[in-house]
Each structure stands twice: as structure tokens, then as C-alpha cells.
């Protein structure tokens, strides 16, 4: 199975989700510390050149591959990737199940503003504190989203491709 966490930029909640998924963060709903947030690999590190790139982060405890993608528009990238994977399944005997999990609903307003200041305007002195504030606000939701994503991945065995929009995790 392949898990692909995705959102607009691919560098904040997606990286938090990967860190939870790969047991690099405490496996609980407790609030993260500033150091834990800032030490998440790739957190606030990706640039616009990274949009649309599938980034491999490792294999989980069950041996499943975990990726992220900054997709800008969910209306284009995720459906295109879903159709590509279905084509590979049908025509070329590609045998991996794919779970796309959208982390965008977990993004709180401070994180949106922090991403804008830090990634777009390059004003880290304003952006990073807002990102940390936002990450602390949403970390429990991101943790629950990851747990849900894993459950769905294990339970939807008949589906080749699963797309989770995750609106129930809205911040």
C-alpha cells in the first residue's frame, strides 16, 4: 500500500502527518512543543519548485510507503494521479493500493498566514511563529487524521485507490 498525504503547499500539515504516520512524533493528541514542530523534517522547507513532486518519506511499521505532495489545486492533481494509478492497475498489473489523504481541512488560520509570510513573502520572523502557533492548534486533528487514514487503508481492501478529503477534521 502507498499513502500520499497532500495539501496546497505540502510543507506544513503534510509533514506533520508524515511524522505522526512514521512514529517520529509522540503518538497521542497532546500539544506538540515548538522544538518538536520545528524539528519535523521538511517542515516549512519546501519551495514552489517542489509543488507537484511526490516526496518519499519512508515505510511505516507495516512496510507501507509514505509520500507527500504539494498539489496547489486538489481539483487537478489528485484526480490526475488517481486516474494514472487506476490505469496502471488495469493495464499494467500494478498491484499497490493507494490512499490519498488531504490534510488541508486541518489547517488553521494562523498556519495559513504563517505559510504566506514565510514561504511567499520570505518574512520568517513573522511567518514561523504563526506556523508554530497553527501547528500547536491543529496537531491533535492531524494525529486523528493520520489514525483515520491508516484505518481506512486497512479496511478498504477492495478499493484500488481511496481518496480521503477529510472534511471531518476541519479546524
Regions found by a protein language model. Name each.
Residues 1-4, 12, 16-171:
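Non-transmembrane, aqueous-exposed alpha-helical and coiled segments at domain scale
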Amino acid at each position: 500500500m502507498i499513502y500520499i498525504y497532500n495539501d496546497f503547499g505540502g510543507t506544513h500539515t503534510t509533514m506533520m502527518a508524515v511524522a505522526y504516520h512514521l512514529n517520529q512524533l509522540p503518538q497521542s493528541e497532546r500539544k506538540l512543543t515548538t522544538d518538536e514542530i520545528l524539528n519535523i523534517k521538511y517542515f516549512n522547507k519546501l519551495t514552489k519548485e517542489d509543488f507537484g513532486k511526490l516526496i518519499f518519506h519512508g515505510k511505516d511499521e507495516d512496510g507501507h510507503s509514505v509520500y507527500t505532495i504539494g498539489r496547489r489545486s486538489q481539483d487537478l492533481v489528485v484526480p490526475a494521479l488517481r486516474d494514472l494509478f487506476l490505469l496502471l492497475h488495469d493495464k499494467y498489473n500494478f498491484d499497490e493500493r493507494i490512499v490519498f489523504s488531504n490534510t488541508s481541512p486541518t489547517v488553521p488560520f494562523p498556519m495559513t498566514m504563517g505559510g504566506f509570510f514565510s514561504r511567499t513573502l520570505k518574512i520568517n520572523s513573522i511567518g514561523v511563529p504563526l506556523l508554530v502557533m497553527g501547528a500547536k492548534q491543529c496537531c491533535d486533528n492531524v494525529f486523528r487524521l493520520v489514525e483515520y487514514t491508516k484505518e481506512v487503508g486497512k479496511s478498504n481492501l477492495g478499493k484500488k485507490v481511496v481518496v480521503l478529503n477529510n472534511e471531518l477534521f476541519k479546524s
